């Protein structure tokens, strides 16, 4: 990669703030550009304190004092990526400040329109104040759109730089290591087995190459896409249990799922188009309905041809398929957030991890203060004891001392509700005792032996204004990717060791209870047991 010279990033324009502390909004022009930015301080009227329920979103340290010291220097690859990542960190903070400004301006408008306040003001004064606030809001919204563009550009830039680095420095490494594992047991695995024998601890055996999927694991309904991602003229290609499928809407608007391979010459159908509820192959124009039947063969006689299709349903904003051979279960599980929550983000990502390993990670919270030190667990203390409290026969419970409820919902779903009144402070509160909450849905669809399609949905029971701000989709995706990246480097390391023979469940302890129960459930499914554990 060519060397680069660092100059103050166009994405991180310097911003001036008023040094005086007041309850009003201070404005100064940035050193560059003609747009205005806003700083918010609050001692007198307590506006910031008034929004304490939103503090988790805005309690982020100003990162500008930690800018990389590379101004005017030639950069190597790692330094260039460090600068790009700093841009992302700065934009994260900047976007939060823009949002807080709009929220406080909105409250000031409400205060001006308050009938009690108007009793002491003339109509002219009220009009003047509203006109001023309207101007402030207009400029603040303009800044939000600028932030949105910056976020998009910064994320694209970082992704491009990381792709270049991977191409230049890491060609084929991951594929070689993960796709061609050694079947022999490593020395470290032998040591772990010896330690297990000495301690007498009970372990699960999860080691070696990922075995073929049990047909019994396929006999469940699997969520594969969000309704919002499947328009009438779009397709969603997926991989499920190492088979390619494509989802699209039929003429009646209902979703269907067919094998993503044309019966004629095996061309991927998702490269084509959807015409009047039929998917058209881009090679010779053959068209298929949602049940897999070929309805059109241009330039030749229509033959009776059908490709494989799967049962496919739509419920509560999600698309589901049944990939198994048994008749589909008559009822789909509900994955809706609890009453009072509003969905703010729905994201889909493909991750290079076996889906069971990813579920192990999501069902474990004890790792948070050690792994997520730069995201949601920043500042968390390490408790002397972490416990997961659950019914004897359940796959759900709550974490002590964390205010978090969690549930594993077969076959591959994790639901969690997190109390976020005071992030970074552990006070032993239960989820119910917290005033504000984050609800998360994680779906870990088994794409292939070393690949997972992750569906993530985030809901809040506060700050509904965030739903309508234009840049929030980028911001939520950035947050989710930050957290996942902290996990992935560890889980990929586990996967490499596992493929080489190490047992990743060699020595479970008390706080591993939910993960162990998932593995016991999974083993019973793979065996084809009539009665599954923790199911009643």
Swiss-Prot record:
Name by which UniProt lists this protein: Chlorophyllide a oxygenase, chloroplastic
GO molecular function: 2 iron, 2 sulfur cluster binding; chlorophyllide a oxygenase activity; iron ion binding
Organism: Arabidopsis thaliana (Mouse-ear cress)
E.C. number(s) listed in UniProt: 1.14.13.122
Example of a GO cellular component annotation carried by this entry: chloroplast
Coiled coil: 123-150
Gene3D superfamilies in alphabetical order: Naphthalene 1,2-dioxygenase Alpha Subunit, Chain A, domain 1, Rieske [2Fe-2S] iron-sulphur domain
Membrane topology listed for this record: Peripheral membrane protein
